[in-house]
UniProtKB/Swiss-Prot annotation:
Key words of the record: Arginine metabolism, NAD, Oxidoreductase
Name of the gene this protein is made from: astD
Lineage: Bacteria, Pseudomonadati, Pseudomonadota, Gammaproteobacteria, Alteromonadales
Protein name: N-succinylglutamate 5-semialdehyde dehydrogenase
Residues involved in NAD(+) binding: 220-225
Origin superkingdom: Bacteria
Organism: Shewanella sp. (strain W3-18-1)
Length: 486
């Protein structure tokens, strides 16, 4: 069980790949990658199944998607444990991920009707009707940080709209993808409607470049997303939806309850071991005694964050990063900031060789004139002290990204001022910036995306509008146009 093509499981014909539990280094999955020929077979299966899937009608498609929801409910403990083992995230967090997957079904059905439903109006020229049709065959590229929830957020609305799907998950989380597709199979999805191909860069390239796909929905790094954008620049007939990363700012101004502010900072910067695209990377704190007090409390709180394996009891706040390589990358990022003039307030350390376990870090980078505009994808927060609110907003906007941003402030006027000037697709006030609603769009501007917001707006890129003017019979107008005679 590695690849799922035309309703059947197949072993790969490529090279061996394994999945490692990053918290202990144990191998938990083995398989072989899909070759270009197997990718082609998956696309052909999706193409052959697409029209019949569309012609089933929305209600019949929804019934199968709701059967998938029932499968998620029945298997939520196994799915949460699989996500925890493969990503290193603690069990409490993976349980919430599965809950979000279950909730996505109702949200996607509501979004289908609200964003891409059918509307008819009588006009003097006839009945004007707006309908939406699926693009056809779409590829979904999933990330490792939310290997269930994020691809699910593409797959469910794509299927509801009448598309067929080829799912290519992260090579770091193949076991989660295999279980997800198993549940789709148990839900009764017709053969060819969803297909799974596992692999690394070569598999992804074979799928992304296939001439018979009509669209690609990607969640992942800005670098890969930009390469896909360049590749698709000459293909205006294909829909491309990119959800990429961010170098996200969080500003603190005039907050009396500093303990509550510190809590929101921790949730913004360190949840999921800093491996959420919306995590705060830069923290702006006012100069002065109030800011000093907040930072002192923050330093103490960061030092007390519990880190441990996915199954530790009592449960930790932070689990493992996705790999030892990722952990070493964060140590290197911290060293780079220190070389530029940063000052350690709390040192990020690699806790155990052979694992992705790291402690959270906090670096004062106020003395660095120009911060690297990089998404350090881990639990490393950069602190900047500021003296003027306008200066803080200006610094916050000094990034090519534009995913999430936040303000913790007691003044509504300060928030209105901030909201009008900050450049980001997700802007929160007095809430963690890693908190997003599935009933709202999710996406950013700049290097964070290509104006194809997901979540509630995913329906928008899963279908295209069809405008019609209709009448029940052919009829002559009351008056012919000048120059005509009949």
């Amino acid at each position: 069980m590695t690849h799922y093509i035309q309703g059947q499981w197949h072993t790969g014909n490529g090279h061996d790949v394994t999945s490692i539990n990053p918290a202990n280094g144990e191998t938990i999955w083995c398989g072989k990658t899909a070759t270009a020929e197997q990718v082609n077979a998956a696309v052909e299966a999706a193409r052959a199944a697409q029209f019949d899937w569309f012609m089933l009608g929305f209600d019949a498609r929804l019934a199968i998607v709701e059967a998938y929801r029932s499968q998620l409910e029945a298997n939520k403990a196994e799915l949460a444990e699989t996500i925890a083992q493969e990503t290193g995230k603690p069990q409490w967090e993976t349980a919430t991920e599965v809950g979000a997957m279950i909730g996505k079904i109702a949200l996607s059905a509501a979004a289908y009707h609200k964003r891409t439903g059918t509307e008819a109006n009588d006009t003097p020229a006839g009945r004007a009707v707006i309908r939406h049709k699926p693009h056809g065959v779409v590829a979904v590229f999933g990330p490792y940080n939310f290997p269930g929830h994020l691809p699910n957020g593409h797959i469910v609305p794509a299927l509801l709209a009448g598309n067929t799907v080829i799912f290519k998950p992260s090579e770091l989380t193949p076991k989660v993808a295999e279980l997800m597709v198993t549940l789709w199979d148990k839900a009764g999805l017709p053969a060819g409607v969803i297909n799974l191909v596992q692999g690394e860069v070569d598999t992804g390239k074979a799928l992304a470049s296939h001439p018979q796909i009509d669209g690609l929905f990607f969640t992942g790094s800005s670098r890969t997303g930009h390469l896909l954008h360049q590749q698709y620049a000459g293909h205006p007939g294909k829909i491309l939806a990119l959800e990429m990363g961010g170098n996200n700012p969080l500003i603190i101004k005039g907050v009396q309850d500093i303990k509550a502010a510190v809590h929101d900072i921790l949730q913004s910067a360190y949840i999921s071991s800093g491996q959420r695209c919306t995590c705060a990377r830069r923290l702006y704190v006012e100069q002065g005694e109030q800011g000093d007090a907040l930072i002192a409390l923050l330093v103490d709180a960061v030092k007390q964050i519990k880190v441990g394996p996915w199954n530790a009891q009592p449960q930790p706040f932070m689990g493992s990063m996705i790999s030892e390589t990722a952990a070493k990358g964060m140590v290197a990022a911290q060293a780079n900031l220190l070389d530029l003039g940063g000052k350690v307030l709390v040192e990020l350390t690699h806790l155990q060789a052979g694992t992705g376990l790291v402690s959270p870090g906090l670096i004062d980078v106020t003395a660095i004139d120009v911060l690297p505009d990089e998404e350090y994808f881990g639990p490393l927060l950069q602190l900047v002290r500021y003296g003027d609110f306008d200066q803080a907003i200006k610094l916050a906007n000094q990034t090519r990204y534009g995913l999430s941003a936040g303000l913790l402030a007691d003044s509504r006027e300060d928030y209105d001022y901030f909201l009008a000037r900050i450049r980001a697709g997700i802007v929160n006030w007095n809430k963690q910036i890693t908190g997003a609603s599935g009933a709202a769009p999710f996406g950013g501007v700049g290097a964070s995306g290509n104006h194809r917001a997901s979540a509630f707006y995913a329906a928008d890129y899963c279908a295209y509008p069809v405008a019609s003017v209709e009448a029940d019979a052919v009829s002559l107008p009351a008056t012919l146009s000048p120059g005509l005679s009949l």
